[in-house]
UniProtKB/Swiss-Prot annotation:
GO terms for biological process: positive regulation of viral entry into host cell; protein autoprocessing; proteolysis. It comes from Mus musculus. It comes from the Eukaryota. Belongs to the peptidase S1 family. Keywords: Autocatalytic cleavage, Calcium, Cell membrane, Disulfide bond, Glycoprotein, Hydrolase, Membrane, Metal-binding, Protease, Secreted, Serine protease, Signal-anchor, Transmembrane, Transmembrane helix, Zymogen. This is Transmembrane protease serine 2.
Length: 490
């Protein structure tokens, strides 16, 4: 985490993060524009998107910008890692053909019409009326396992209606916690049920999904039917995991590069390869870590190389704490290392983390949340405190404001290199930034008393340079993909 002297400049008016935008104001199938976050149709979550990599030069129409991932330097150029990379490279030779085969189908375009929906990576198109109708039509059944979601800052449970082709809140009438457990399981949570309760409907909804308690032993969403009334006028608020809370109650704001105290950022993990800190990550469940895709590029794509450490502030003390081996590494299937689009990956741990005051999960963002243009966010990590510096021994954290996509894409900053799957954050004066070693770590914000993961540290041009803010993977566009992986690999 790099620091330069100077006060932050003013940022400007409010804007809407379209990754969170309410569905009713979204067009049915928007074009991808360079200066904004994706808008998603009401009837489904966004289909998967691409990823990122080490130290590349991206050509721009004006000056050339050297973009550097925030991992611990170039893995195979550091003298301390040269022998490691040579050994790992030997293991990748036999898999080269398989990787090449994967590359052949990575980049595909949707051919579905506006009245159809796409079945994940298979590219099959089905009518939107068949989505969540109780019969699997997609090759992998995606149309029947993406039928429930949590909405907004209050975690309102919503279910998709295939007849109405829209999402509706679930009425509290006849609801019980057993249904809450079923809904959490449908989303991909494993034995993490936290709580459900009825809360007053403040959205002005005129339609609901209600339980048919006599429908027998079938999937939860098959028990629900569309209704224009809800006698209790209460809707279900569902928490599948206690996330986004800290044990410490700090009153002072972190403005730049302060050493973290125990429990400040309990979702932060350090990801090691053979005893070396390489990247950061964020805890979202006892078994799952969110990190950056460029962290796990070859030769580090195999889970056997990775160890996660949680709840420890100093790198020098990591090996005195508990370590967790990684069981699976799942990089986004459309990861593009050249354009740096959609830099996200997941790690599943062999054994679950034990949550305590020092180890807690952060919340994944829900659809329907809004962010201000200069929304205060926080970054944390063990990255270098200056460009080309060494990894920090102690965990550092700093506040950075969001930057409007159109401003970040101006020719004086990143000149249209920022896609809807990226978020810019920092001070244009260059006072605070993430740096090498921070890659994959969290960009979080506090709303409604809850900490939300809205970005993973991705890339930038240098560290804390003027007009070169940090760039982060836009987690708001990846939540559906994350839930898909949790379901498929539970």
């Amino acid at each position: 985490m790099a620091l330069n002297s100077g006060s932050p400049p003013g940022i400007g008016p409010c804007y809407e993060n379209h990754g969170y935008q309410s569905e009713h104001i979204c067009p049915p199938r928007p074009p991808v524009a360079p200066n904004g976050y994706n808008l998603y149709p009401a009837q489904y979550y966004p289909s998967p998107v691409p990823q990122y990599a080490p130290r590349i030069t991206t050509q721009a129409s004006t000056s050339v910008i050297h973009t550097h991932p925030k991992s611990s330097g170039a893995l195979c150029t550091s003298k301390s890692k040269k022998s490691l990379c040579l050994a790992l490279a030997l293991g990748t030779v036999l898999t080269g053909a398989a990787v090449a085969a994967v590359l052949l189908w990575r980049f595909w375009d949707s051919n579905c019409s506006t009245s159809e929906m796409e079945c994940g990576s298979s590219g099959t198109c089905i009518s939107s009326s068949l989505w969540c109708d109780g019969v699997a039509h997609c090759p992998n059944g995606e149309d029947e396992n993406r039928c429930v979601r949590l909405y907004g800052q209050s975690f309102i449970l919503q279910v998709y209606s295939s007849q109405r082709k829209a999402w509706y809140p679930v009425c509290q009438d006849d609801w019980s916690e057993s249904y809450g457990r079923a809904a959490c399981k449908d989303m991909g949570y494993k034995n993490n049920f936290y709580s459900s309760q009825g809360i007053p409907d403040q959205s002005g909804a005129t339609s609901f999904m209600k339980l048919n308690v006599s429908s027998g032993n079938v999937d939860l969403y098959k028990k629900l039917y569309h209704s224009d009334s809800c006698s209790s006028r209460m809707v279900v608020s569902l928490r599948c995991i206690e996330c986004g809370v800290r044990s410490v109650k700090r009153q002072s704001r972190i403005v730049g590069g302060l050493n973290a105290s125990p429990g400040d950022w309990p979702w932060q993990v350090s990801l090691h390869v053979q005893g070396v800190h390489v990247c950061g990550g964020s805890i979202i469940t006892p078994e799952w870590i969110v990190t950056a895709a460029h962290c796990v590029e070859e030769p580090l794509s195999s889970p056997r190389y990775w160890t996660a450490f949680a709840g420890i502030l100093r790198q020098s003390l990591m090996f005195y704490g508990s370590r967790h081996q990684v069981e699976k590494v799942i990089s986004h299937p459309n990861y593009d290392s050249k354009t740096k689009n959609n830099d996200i990956a997941l790690m599943k741990l062999q054994t679950p983390l034990a949550f305590n005051d020092l180890v807690k999960p952060v919340c994944l963002p829900n659809p329907g949340m809004m962010l201000d243009l200069d929304q205060e966010c926080w970054i944390s990590g063990w990255g270098a405190t200056y460009e080309k510096g060494k990894t920090s021994d102690v965990l550092n954290a700093a506040m950075v404001p969001l930057i409007e996509p159109s401003k970040c894409n101006s020719k004086y900053i990143y000149n249209n290199l920022i896609t809807p799957a990226m978020i810019c954050a920092g001070f244009l004066q260059g006072s605070v930034d993430s740096c090498q070693g921070d890659s994959g770590g969290p960009l979080v914000t506090l709303k409604n008393g809850i900490w939300w993961l809205i970005g993973d540290t991705s890339w930038g041009s240098g560290c804390a340079k003027a007009l070169r803010p940090g760039v982060y993977g836009n987690v708001t566009v990846f939540t559906d993909w994350i839930y898909q992986q949790m379901r498929a690999n539970s």
